[in-house]
From Swiss-Prot:
This protein's UniProt keywords: Disulfide bond, Ion channel impairing toxin, Neurotoxin, Secreted, Signal, Toxin
Organism superkingdom: Eukaryota
Identification of the protein by name: Putative neurotoxin-G
MF (Gene Ontology): ion channel regulator activity; toxin activity
Provenance organism: Lychas mucronatus (Chinese swimming scorpion)
Disulfide bond positions: C25-C45, C32-C54, C36-C56
């Protein structure tokens, strides 16, 4: 019983996370870029049609 409740809770949490990522990656990913910019990172949307997951990555510029 405990395992079933745990799995259900994890599924509900993960579906909420994916819904938030879809919102961030709609409209060309501008919300993802803005969201990640708060942490001085670059927002990249990827997944099916480029709108399933917003990922914040650190941008390192090479110095010449």
């Amino acid at each position: 019983m405990f395992a079933m409740v745990t799995v259900t809770v994890l599924l509900l949490i993960s579906s909420g996370i994916f819904c938030e990522n879809e919102k961030l990656c709609s409209n060309g990913g501008t919300k993802c870029t803005h969201h990640c910019g708060k942490n001085n990172t670059v927002g990249i949307c990827h997944g099916q049609n480029g709108n399933l997951k917003c990922e914040c990555v650190e941008y390192k510029r090479k110095m010449f």
